[in-house]
């Protein structure tokens, strides 16, 4: 389903809000220049600093403007399991092809806590979930063993931004 270059989009702002015109131009720029897929509301898109309304709008606009030309992998992660479920459910209803879910940041969950977090999201949502392991930002590193456990129930993709060569 996902191949090639899937670009993490920035979220442009103007004055006190989302610059929708610039964002739409950015989406079309990537599609017109051969990008394989779009990733709105990820770390590059400043997802932790977006309001819920902004977050949802960024995802909705990306899905609408891409119009099925390329897959959309919506950033829906949160340190709150219920919030991640809510954001993922919204992305699914809006038409996202998958969700990019960052490991819960700040709270430092155990490996079992990480497993339960992703399992709860997977159990409530019907789109593929990509595990986004980025310990330099989230302050938690998902172990390979935890990833292997998660793969047992359809979490088939990982974006691993760990600095450790041994984790590859």
Locations of regions flagged by a protein language model:
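Single conserved hydrophobic/aromatic residue that forms the stacking wall/gate
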Residues: 157-168
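Active-site beta->alpha loop and helix N-cap motifs at the rims of alpha/beta catalytic domains
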Residues: 14, 19-139
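Catalytic alpha/beta core domains of metabolic enzymes, predominantly
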Residues: 137-159
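Generic N-terminal amphipathic, Lys/Arg-enriched alpha-helix
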Residues: 3-14, 41
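ATP/adenylate-binding site constellation spanning eukaryotic-like Ser/Thr protein kinases
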Residues: 126, 144, 164
